Amino acid sequence: MTSDPLTGTPAATPASPAPLPSLRLVDVACRRGDRILFSGLNETLERGQLLWLRGGNGRGKTSLLRLVAGLAAPERGQILWDGVPTRGNEHFDRALVYIAHANALKDDLTATESLAFLARVHGRDAGAPALRAALARLGLAGRERTPVRSLSQGLRRRVALARLALETGPSLGVLDEPFDALDVAGTATLHALLAAHRARGGSVLLTSHHLHLDGAAAGAGFRVLDLDLLPRDGGTAP
């Protein structure tokens, strides 16, 4: 133990930083209608990691994202954030950034107004400077006042993805097909955004049918979860 050089009293030991919370899925099963899409899912997503969900059509990729986002409940199992169930968990709600496959933009609003609306709906109150900066990071500088109806599908996707650029802390990005409709430049921009998000301790759970993701592009902490390898009904995988 060290001591204060002036008083000779023992110096306080610096407290270790609290570990950043992680997402845990414990024996999760997902039902849609009368079918079990998958069961027996046990997975942990640590801060700074990116987990890419893969699987054939109808295997439950989007359904799993909806379970994590709290839009549906698992048939069995638990979804935990820092060891606490995510349902009704205010800490998790504040950390979650869910961007669905549909952009959920209103044609009559401008890009800035749309981003502000999306932020408010999800509990974020972003000021004008933050909105401008987020849109600029997605390559939308100069289009802030452009009505959504005048934007291409790729640019609309960038507006929706700018929600992640508003984040300043280690949040959880849950993204359904984020690369859809993006051109080469937009794809590179999204890769940079994901890297910056993870560098500050954020984590990412996403689906993508596009071959834009690999270990080299995503860097350390990149993992793949193949839902095709999970059993549908608690038995063996197909």
Language model feature labels by segment:
Residues W52, R156-A165:
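ABC ATPase nucleotide-binding domain "signature" region
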Residues R54-G56:
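The feature captures the beta-strand-to-loop junction immediately N-terminal to the Walker
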Residues A116, A128-R143, A162:
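Conserved ABC ATPase "signature" region
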Residues L23, L37-G40:
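Conserved structural motif at the start of ABC-family nucleotide-binding domains
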Residues P74-F92:
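Conserved ABC transporter NBD signature motif
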Residues G173-E177:
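Catalytic Walker B motif of ABC-type/P-loop ATPase nucleotide-binding domains
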Residues A69:
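Helix-to-loop junction immediately C-terminal to a conserved catalytic motif
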Residues A102, D107-G123, A130:
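Q-loop/switch helix immediately C-terminal to the Walker
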